[in-house]
């Protein structure tokens, strides 16, 4: 009994005297004989008669290939005048794929063995959703609680009270310090780096920053001040929009930030799609880039690439 090619099917000749044929209905893999692809994909029924029939015993469906013997290495195909076709065929050891369609594998062992381009692990039966506890860019909740306790002690010491109204005012002063002096880990404070309360008390930036750093000591955070204050992002934005916080316009100008984007470009705020629109996100990114560029130029004037000359013009 002979096997005949059909339109709409995908075939591949496997080198075994060009008699063994692989059959599928998808577009993955490579064809060893370009004429098969041409005639079956783009040809007519009449053109199929130009391809010799193959004995049925040498035809293998895609599913059977997984258990078939290992195929010998293919010989380099002879050069042909016609343009090379796009790689289309079938994926061994997997279900047949159709163009632009994923195959979902329920067995994780099979998925890990295959790791195919068009294969996804089937998660339909999983009801648990991973919960992110500690977000990147922030200190952990546990460390934040330690810092909160330390700042409460500082509040009582500096403000002379720790009632709710006093705590609220104190944290407004803490945020104002961040807006005025920013939160770079390399900042060195001077004796006049402080802000005054309504009743004339002085709150020094170094007090606040050292309090946070000491509470987060030995936790491994690169910049605990910035990563702690990131929790105050919504408060920073709303307080700035409502005129409760005053920006350091000199630094904002150095970073190239227009006034309407001041609330979104304080260096300790963390972008969130709940509070940032696309323009605010762009402004935040551009401010970061400019700040990094300024820091790099200040730290090292060595010319590493001629394109750096363009940035200096």
Curated annotation (Swiss-Prot):
What family is reported? Belongs to the closteroviridae capsid protein family.
Q: Which UniProt keywords apply?
A: Capsid protein, Helical capsid protein, Virion
Q: Which InterPro entries match?
A: Closter_coat
Where is it localised? Virion
UniProt organism field: Grapevine leafroll-associated virus 3 (isolate United States/NY1) (GLRaV-3)
Please verify whether the record's keywords include Transmembrane: no
Instruction: Report the protein's function.
Output: Capsid protein self-assembles to form filamentous capsids, about 1400-2200 nm in length.
- Annotated membrane-spanning segments are none
How is this protein named in the record?
Capsid protein
GO cellular-component terms in the record?
Answer: helical viral capsid
Instruction: Indicate the principal place this protein occupies in or around the cell.
Output: virion
